[in-house]
A protein has these predicted regions:
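Metal-dependent amide/peptide-bond hydrolase catalytic core
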Residues: 1-135
Length: 135
């Protein structure tokens, strides 16, 4: 198995084309290879709308004394499907933890309620903003 990650559709097309070339040009006589995509996640790329959503989340956290900084991890998440549909989304705003998807994964338990509160307040601010702009 090969885990291929890409930032956008152009990168995907290029990488898949190059892998296909490798599969076609076998170097051992009597052998063949093929590329079989077993699963795929869409990349999560920032949009102005998702940046605005993240800014609201960061403002909420900051109002409670927590500084949140964004990063692009290059990982795979369901949020990529949401973004691909054109819906603003933020990812990785759950509890504080580390060593994700490994046997030694951990979570700072007291951060779970804190991050849930941040998200609830973010949703509340979005609702207030929507109400104010629709009047």
């Amino acid at each position: 198995d090969i885990d291929i990650r890409y930032r956008d559709d152009a990168d995907r097309a290029y990488i898949f084309e190059e892998v296909e070339k490798i599969c076609i040009n076998t170097s051992v006589e009597g052998t063949s290879s093929e590329m079989l995509v077993k699963g795929e996640f869409h990349p999560l790329n920032p949009t102005p709308q998702s940046a605005e959503l993240f800014d609201i989340y960061c403002d909420v956290a900051k109002s409670e004394g927590v500084n949140i900084e964004g990063e692009h991890s290059g990982g795979c998440a369901d949020s990529g499907f949401i973004a691909a549909a054109g819906t603003p989304v933020i990812c990785g705003v759950g509890p504080v933890g580390g060593n994700y998807h490994r046997p030694d994964e951990w979570m700072q338990v007291d951060s779970l309620s804190e991050r849930a509160r941040f998200m609830a307040k973010t949703i509340q601010k979005l609702a207030e903003k929507t109400t104010a702009t629709s009047l």
